Amino acid sequence: MDPNEKAVYLTFDDGPIPEVTPWVLDLLDKHNIKATFFMVGDNIRKHPDEFRMVVERGHRIGNHTFNHIRGFEYTAKNYLGNTEQAKIFMEMGGDINCNVEKVLYPLLFRPPHGHMFANQYLTLKRTYKIVMWDLVTRDYSKRMRPEQALNN
């Protein structure tokens, strides 16, 4: 990620989700676009087929903790442990036989809700490239109409 490069990076959080991930992957394939998926470890456990689809199509994967926990609500030990649990699970390929090395390294991390304490950040940045976001469409809101999300 060259700061001087003019680029747009598409990222998707909280997956894999069977109702959404295949549709997003098909749309990305249609336009020959690669993206980064910040995965929740427990969702990988619950939806290994969707995890495999992301990996096999060559998209990057990043760590989004095992249980999508908020850093401000946990001690550093618990937060870092939950993050490590997700990392181990992703390195194992989510208990499925797929090669994740080409899409997992270098390690990326995005904190759920964008929140974590400074000590959590300082520890994680030794292992991960911390990736935040510039634009939140709020497309996850049940009260948000598609047109509103598009205009965010």
Predicted regions span which residues?
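Active-site beta->alpha N-cap acidic-glycine motif
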Residues: M1-F72, N78, Q85, F89, ...
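Alpha-helical scaffold elements lining the catalytic groove of polysaccharide deacetylases
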Residues: V20, I69-N99, H115-N152
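A short coil-to-beta-strand element that immediately follows conserved catalytic motifs
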Residues: N99-L108
